[in-house]
């Protein structure tokens, strides 16, 4: 089970910058060291636990990149232009006989080249006369020739420890003949929502109640990221009830995520319980939306307390939750690729906090431009569905004008 070190970060009324919070957290969480070996067919989105070294060359032999005719270039270079056709080499059925001088082999794409043959002329560029191949004067050595190991060389590192496997990566491993692979075990993560006003979708909605959208959103995010997820339902605004549920969750999971209950209201119990049962490492970030977010440990189990407002929960999960989970799960952290893109709107904000706008990347007059959702509140969940990513406005900026540039990052990259 993933655990935190016992260091506690000092915090007070001052808001913490997101970057500061992440740096503090990264220093105090221990990546998973539990490794298992699994079939490569079941390795999608799993994290490689040891460097993978190529045990063979890919391709394993020199072969033809096209359908055509193979020759020995030095014979052509000597001035010869007419070659007798000795035989045929096809994929899976190489030509095995010895060849005479000035002989060509008809060859199909992917077929092995006979020893010494190093140049292939495309069939449509060839002239056949009297059962012989007649070549033009513009042939170059190694035309259409795939060298042994030109894709992957024997003993080269193919993937480093910490790499998250994608479909194309699995294809590469199959090409190398890898059947099983060592990966870090999947984190077991449980998700709660907090609040007496929340209702599950299978129950009728009472006056003053809302359906619990945060929990299902987070569960689906985590499933997409290939964690083992347990949906533990809604926590009532009752300290005794919450304590019992969190006690059980901390015994059976590697990580706990809650939404709601992180502010200072009379019925906000999550933060006080974290402080009572463990440590609150980070609380209240200088961001919008998502200020009432916290991270700590509950009975030595890492716990992330997200805001109750759905758009705020969405943003803080992407910007704080995912980096934490990546590190604990053993995934190599790669710096986000932010793109400076022009905006088609004006915007004002308070200095001292970073803002994350839900924006859509569009193409106008062959130029990329960002559009902002028409409402910005922390409770506007529809903005997250409309948007393609986040537009980030730095702490010190107070005003943006149309055609200014802001940093943009897509949801797909954040979830990669």
Feature locations, PLM:
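Conserved active-site and cofactor/substrate-binding residues in soluble primary-metabolism enzymes
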Residues: 13-20, 35-42, 66, 80, ...
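Short, low-complexity N-terminal leaders and the immediately following helix N-cap/first helix
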Residues: 1-79, 131, 333-358
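Structural signal for hydrophobic packing residues in well-ordered secondary-structure cores
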Residues: 26-33, 51, 113, 156-163, ...
């Amino acid at each position: 089970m993933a655990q935190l070190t016992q260091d506690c970060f000092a915090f007070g009324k001052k808001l913490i910058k997101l970057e500061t919070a992440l740096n503090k957290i990264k220093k105090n969480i221990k990546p998973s060291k539990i490794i298992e070996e699994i079939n490569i067919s079941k390795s999608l989105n799993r994290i490689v636990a040891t460097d993978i070294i190529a045990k063979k060359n890919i391709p394993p032999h020199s072969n033809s990149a096209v359908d055509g005719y193979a020759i020995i270039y030095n014979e052509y270079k000597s001035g010869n232009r007419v070659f007798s056709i000795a035989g045929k080499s096809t994929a899976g059925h190489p030509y095995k006989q010895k060849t005479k001088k000035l002989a060509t082999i008809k060859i199909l794409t992917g077929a092995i080249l006979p020893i010494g043959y190093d140049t292939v002329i495309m069939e449509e560029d060839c002239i056949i006369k009297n059962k012989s191949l007649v070549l033009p004067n513009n042939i170059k050595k190694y035309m259409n020739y795939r060298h042994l190991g030109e894709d992957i060389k024997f003993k080269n590192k193919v993937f480093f420890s910490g790499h998250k496997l994608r479909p194309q990566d699995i294809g590469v491993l199959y090409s190398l003949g890898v059947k099983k692979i060592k990966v870090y075990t999947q984190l077991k993560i449980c998700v709660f929502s907090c609040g007496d006003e929340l209702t599950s979708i299978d129950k009728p909605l009472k006056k003053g109640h809302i359906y619990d959208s945060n929990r299902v959103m987070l569960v689906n995010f985590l499933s997409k990221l290939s964690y083992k997820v347990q949906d533990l339902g809604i926590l009532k605004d009752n300290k005794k009830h919450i304590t019992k549920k969190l006690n059980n969750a901390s015994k059976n999971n590697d990580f706990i995520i809650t939404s709601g209950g992180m502010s200072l209201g009379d019925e906000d119990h999550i933060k006080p319980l974290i402080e009572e049962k463990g440590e609150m490492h980070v609380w209240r970030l200088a961001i919008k939306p998502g200020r009432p977010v916290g991270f700590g440990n509950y009975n030595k189990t890492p716990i992330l307390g997200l805001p109750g407002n759905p758009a705020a929960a969405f943003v803080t999960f992407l910007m704080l939750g995912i980096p934490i989970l990546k590190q604990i799960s053993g995934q190599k952290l790669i710096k986000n690729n932010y793109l400076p893109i022009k905006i088609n709107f004006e915007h004002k904000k308070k200095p001292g906090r970073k803002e994350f706008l839900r924006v859509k990347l569009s193409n106008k007059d062959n130029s990329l431009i960002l559009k902002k959702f028409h409402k910005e509140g922390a409770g506007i969940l529809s903005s997250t569905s409309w948007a393609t990513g986040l537009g980030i406005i730095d702490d010190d900026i107070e005003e943006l004008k149309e055609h200014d540039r802001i940093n943009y990052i897509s949801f797909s990259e954040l979830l990669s």
